Amino acid sequence: MTTIEKLNAPWEPPQLPSEIPHGDMPGDHISIYPDHVRKAETLFRALRPMLASQLSQSAHGRVVISVCGGSGAGKTGIASVLAYFLRAMGIGTYLLSGDNYPRRIPQDNDQERIRVFRVAGLRGLLAEDQYTPERMAELRKAWEAENDADPQQAVERPWMKTYQQAGRKALAQYLGTPGETDFDEVNQLLASFKQGQNLVYLKRMGRQFDELWYDPVDMTGIEVLLLEWTHGNSEYLFGVDLPILLNSTPAQTLAHRMARNRDGKIDSPFVAMVLDIEQQKLDHQAHKAKLILSREGELLDYVSYRGLSIDTSERGTR
């Protein structure tokens, strides 16, 4: 039976073992919960005919699928289950983590995000002729307290609003862009895979400065490259055939990050701003997704997704 015939045949989800393989991000420890399995089953039933169609059109019989969403959406767990389903059908699948491709390790990137925000904020004050040494002294105190991104700081100080707006604008121009992430390297990797190249070198990036290397990976027999990544539906990313979007909210993302607590300071006003910008970018890119899954595990069309996003945004501002 060919791969396309397998995908078009009746399917029942296999029983998962206690542990299944996950992505290639160094140091990741993944727990698979029943909710991941349930959502993956829903997605897989809709994905199978789409994947069969894409494979039939592929010159080298290779397809790239991405699973994207905020960090609380269950990307890694759901992508791991999808990969297991494909392998159980005898379809060669490699699960790739996009988190290997930022330009800086997490700690350094967090510092760069803050630098971008603060430099732009100061320049915004200068541009509006609102900068004074006294206000700079107040800002230094806010920097030490790490609350200069807190909207409450601007309630009685209009100049702080100028600072925050200018900083947020610059931050939005950095987050999820080629300045932060090496999209060119990922794009080249996807192109090489789809063109039939078997030996590829995949980047590995840990959380320390010297945790950086490349692993040779043999893609012989791999028909599906499954990319698990927040930016898997980005306008800077090329070569994804079937992007899947998992819906989440900034509040869920924050709760997920607090549960992991890998880098500290994750419930700060600045992190809240980062997550809000991230969600806006995901919403902006959502129209390109081939499948959208709600937080409750239901498939959505784009119009329904936008309705949920707008409702969530309005409730968040009340």
Residue ranges of model-derived segments:
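Post-Walker A helix-loop "phosphate-sensing" segment adjacent to the P-loop in P-loop NTPases
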Residues: 84-94
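ATP-dependent NMP and nucleoside kinases share a basic, alpha-helical "lid"
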Residues: 155, 159, 211-260
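Conserved nucleotide-sensing/catalytic segment adjacent to the nucleotide-binding pocket
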Residues: 93-94, 101-208
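NTP-dependent small-molecule kinase module
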Residues: 2-58, 242-245, 255-263, 279-318
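Hydrophobic positions on the alpha1 helix immediately C-terminal to the Walker A/P-loop
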Residues: 78, 82
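Hydrophobic anchor at the beta1->P-loop junction of P-loop NTPases
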Residues: 65-67
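Walker A (P-loop) phosphate-binding loop of P-loop NTPases
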Residues: 72
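Conserved lysine of the Walker
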Residues: 75
